[in-house]
């Protein structure tokens, strides 16, 4: 076969880096991206269709080409180049990351002193974990972590709880004071319930409250994460790593309002999951910033890019200024330009609003204590709050309760003017670039990005003087050592010291490690060992979450043998978890497929029999009424993924009933995600292949909530020693697919122990025939309806 060069007529291929692009008038295209304006205020327009690229060539290759040309052994390569091809950006970040690593080698940067020895592998491995030392926080405000008094007591089984409140008033939130290592009573903690200040009279003033009943181990992880130093959390599949991380960040935001937190993950999907959880908590959206390309996948109406946050701040400014004008009218300042700018509104706050409030509080203190109607009669902003729900605001019969309500109204105004003051910088800064830089370096309290984005943009962050105090790393076991190291150094040192106060690493070293494609680096340099896994090996203390709430207990048995203690949360025994999967006799099965693997190109493994069987089962599920978004098809090889997609496109995508499933992808790509039902194709029929790595097996078997159906060569995989514990569980189920034909999704009340009337499917052809018969019935029903 002809090589690609001969096939496509290529003579020379050279690599280059694009420095800049200009239009027909020689204007840099970068200017269009930053939305610079012409003198008349209109955005600049691109002129003409001609583009001029300035390229940085490979100097060594250029020298070789020119030498060869001068010696008469070659031609002028660069004068003959006539096609410019841009590489896929996702695969093309190596140069920027290499430049970042070189920068780190050439500058004097330091990790925090408390992390130094552990990072290098010296000394006491627990030295960076400050939880059990004198440096640990003595009193922690857990905010809404605990749902009630019983939850708090259950969360600290090793401690006796001493209350400072009477029994009637022990409602959340709580502050907890922990004993020092040398206290007289080291097993007693003091708990205090307190009443948070009234946030205001409007529904939007009320904070979103946590509804997750955290386990004692999760509470221990939250406590460790709030303390300074290094916190390691090992989270097996489904144990609530994301909820725990979100609660740590929520409490950090409230307990350390002056600190900024950097959130790093390996994948965009994990970053978006965590970001959405934070949005559901009591963290104002204006303090959250999402950097990188995956923001468009966020399942939210708000935009969290720099441009999106800047636009939101400007919109917020107009919204609050309208409220300021309404407030001014309500106190008789009609016609005055108090709401013209943020600055004039600030003067209005100090001169009029604060002055009236201070006079009111002074009069309240001086008034007769028996005058219960004072607040209702004298509150200066009653007209402004006339549209608040639950009128009247003040009863006139309880002086203390009315004053508390008045303070809530004032807190609403203070929050409003504080937000307006934060908008002032966006009013003064005129260009989008200046505004987004201010947002990143001064305004945002929680900044989220992937580890790749951190490496790509480190130079920009240093130049912009980014500062942060806390670092939270999710999916820590999937991130390369260097990619974990770089986020610690995205800011300048302060007097030769790192500003970093906390590093929280969350991950699972029993699942897949970082991907290293270069075999020599992987095998001989140990480069596929993450910093998270290295710290665990060194003996650094970690908290291992011990209760999973994702999968049925039958499914969890496939992988919980890999962990010391991994139990099930109560929710896995009720509701949909207790009911059988409609149309299936069992919640999980290994379906023996007598297919032959093939490899059209080396290492591109496919198995057509398995692919057709899997897609037939997907079609059967759709005929039973299963939603397509609840089903994912996974496989262990890229070749099979492409084959499955071809079969799905041919049979399902354009069909009015079937449609495409939520995902058709590889196990490796699906790590960190989950779905209700998983169809898994193992492909190989000659050797076990890379499923022999038990970490990949754990990922593959732990993605499903309610149903897992594995398709493969049973004789081959059941003989594999490494996979034996999982296959002992699968051995309890038959290797021929057993169905309960006629059941419908959502209408099946059968319990998992009841296998119903079983129909045994012997092979893929039998499954195909069953699907064709059921599809024929469905088509006949549609025709009858349309008559």
PLM-predicted stretches and their roles:
Residues 3-9, 17-36, 41-46, 210-213, ...:
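Beta-strand elements of modular eukaryotic interaction domains
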Residues 199-207, 418-424, 471, 680-686:
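Short, basic, glycine/proline-bearing loop/turn elements
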Residues 350, 357-358, 364-469, 479-483, ...:
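Conserved helicase/translocase P-loop NTPase motor core
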Residues 192-315, 428-430, 434, 438-565, ...:
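ASCE P-loop NTPase helicase motor core
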Residues 2-213, 300-388, 395-408, 534:
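Pre-ATPase regulatory/linker segments immediately N-terminal to the P-loop/RecA-like helicase/translocase core
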Residues 452-456, 461-787:
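Conserved helicase motor core of SF1/SF2 NTP-dependent helicases
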């Amino acid at each position: 076969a002809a090589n690609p060069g001969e096939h496509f007529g290529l003579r020379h291929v050279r690599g280059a880096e694009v420095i800049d692009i200009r239009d027909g008038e020689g204007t840099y295209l970068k200017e269009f991206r930053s939305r610079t304006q012409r003198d008349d205020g209109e955005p600049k327009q691109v002129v003409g269709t001609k583009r001029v690229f300035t390229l940085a060539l490979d100097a060594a290759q250029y020298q070789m080409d020119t030498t060869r040309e001068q010696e008469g052994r070659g031609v002028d390569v660069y004068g003959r180049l006539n096609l410019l091809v841009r590489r896929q950006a996702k695969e093309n970040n190596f140069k920027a990351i290499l430049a970042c690593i070189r920068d780190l080698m050439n500058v004097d940067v330091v990790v925090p002193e408390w992390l130094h020895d552990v990072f290098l592998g010296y000394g006491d491995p627990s030295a960076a974990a400050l939880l059990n030392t004198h440096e640990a926080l003595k009193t922690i405000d857990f905010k809404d972590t605990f749902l009630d008094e019983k939850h708090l007591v259950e969360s600290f089984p090793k401690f006796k709880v001493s209350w400072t409140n009477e029994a009637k008033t022990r409602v959340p939130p709580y502050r907890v004071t922990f004993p020092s290592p040398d206290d007289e009573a080291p097993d007693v903690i003091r708990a205090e319930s307190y009443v948070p200040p009234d946030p205001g009279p409007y529904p939007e003033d009320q904070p979103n409250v946590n509804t997750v009943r955290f386990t004692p181990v999760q509470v221990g992880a939250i406590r460790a994460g709030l303390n300074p130093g290094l916190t390691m959390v090992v989270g097996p599949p489904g144990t609530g790593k994301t909820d725990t991380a979100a609660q740590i960040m929520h409490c950090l935001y409230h307990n350390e309002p002056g600190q900024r937190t950097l959130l790093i993950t390996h994948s965009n999907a994990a970053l978006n999951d965590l970001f959405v959880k934070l949005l559901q908590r009591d963290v104002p959206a204006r303090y959250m910033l999402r950097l990188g390309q995956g923001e468009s996948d966020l399942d939210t109406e708000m935009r969290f890019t720099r441009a999106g946050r800047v636009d939101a701040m400007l919109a917020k400014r107009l919204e609050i200024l309208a409220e300021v004008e309404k407030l001014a009218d309500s106190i008789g300042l009609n016609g005055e330009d108090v709401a013209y700018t943020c600055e004039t509104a600030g003067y209005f706050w100090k001169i009029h609003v604060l002055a009236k409030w201070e006079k009111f509080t002074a009069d309240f203190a001086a008034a007769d204590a028996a005058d219960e109607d004072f607040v209702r009669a004298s509150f200066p902003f009653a007209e402004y709050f006339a549209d608040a729900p639950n009128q009247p605001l003040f009863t006139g019969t309880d002086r203390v309760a009315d004053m508390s309500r008045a303070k809530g109204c004032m807190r609403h105004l203070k929050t409003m003017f504080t937000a307006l003051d934060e908008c002032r910088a966006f009013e003064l800064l005129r260009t989008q670039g200046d505004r987004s830089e201010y947002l990143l370096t001064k305004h945002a309290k929680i900044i989220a990005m992937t580890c790749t984005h951190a490496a790509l943009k480190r130079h920009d962050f240093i130049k912009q003087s980014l500062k942060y105090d806390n670092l939270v790393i999710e999916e820590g076991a999937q991130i390369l050592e260097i990619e974990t190291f770089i986020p610690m150094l995205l800011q300048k040192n302060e007097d030769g010291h790192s500003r970093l106060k906390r590093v929280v690493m969350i991950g699972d070293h029993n699942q897949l490690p970082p991907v290293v494609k270069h075999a020599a680096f992987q095998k001989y340099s140990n480069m596929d060992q993450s910093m998270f896994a290295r710290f665990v090996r060194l003996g650094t203390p970690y908290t291992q979450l011990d209760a999973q709430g994702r999968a049925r207990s039958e499914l969890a048995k496939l992988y919980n043998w890999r962990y010391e203690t991994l139990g099930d949360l109560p929710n896995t025994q009720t509701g949909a978890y207790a009911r059988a999967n409609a149309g299936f006799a069992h919640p999980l099965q290994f379906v023996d497929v007598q297919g032959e693997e093939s490899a059209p190109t080396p290492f591109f493994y496919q198995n057509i029999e398995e692919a057709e069987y899997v897609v037939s089962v997907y079609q059967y599920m759709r005929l039973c009424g299963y939603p397509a978004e609840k089903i994912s098809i996974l496989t262990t090889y890229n070749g099979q993924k492409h084959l499955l997609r071809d079969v799905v496109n041919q049979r399902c995508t354009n069909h009015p009933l079937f449609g495409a499933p939520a995902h058709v992808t590889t196990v490796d790509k699906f790590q960190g995600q989950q779905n209700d039902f998983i169809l898994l194709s193992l492909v190989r029929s000659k050797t076990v292949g890379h499923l022999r790595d038990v970490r990949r097996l754990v990922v593959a078997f732990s993605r499903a909530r309610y149903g897992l159906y594995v398709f493969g060569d049973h004789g081959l995989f059941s003989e594999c020693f490494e996979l034996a514990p999982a296959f002992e569980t699968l051995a309890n189920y038959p290797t021929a697919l057993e169905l309960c034909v006629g059941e419908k999704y959502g209408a099946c009340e059968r319990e998992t122990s009841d296998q119903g009337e079983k129909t045994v499917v012997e092979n893929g052809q039998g499954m195909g025939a069953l699907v064709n018969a059921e599809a024929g019935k469905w088509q006949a029903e549609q025709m009858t309806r349309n008559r």
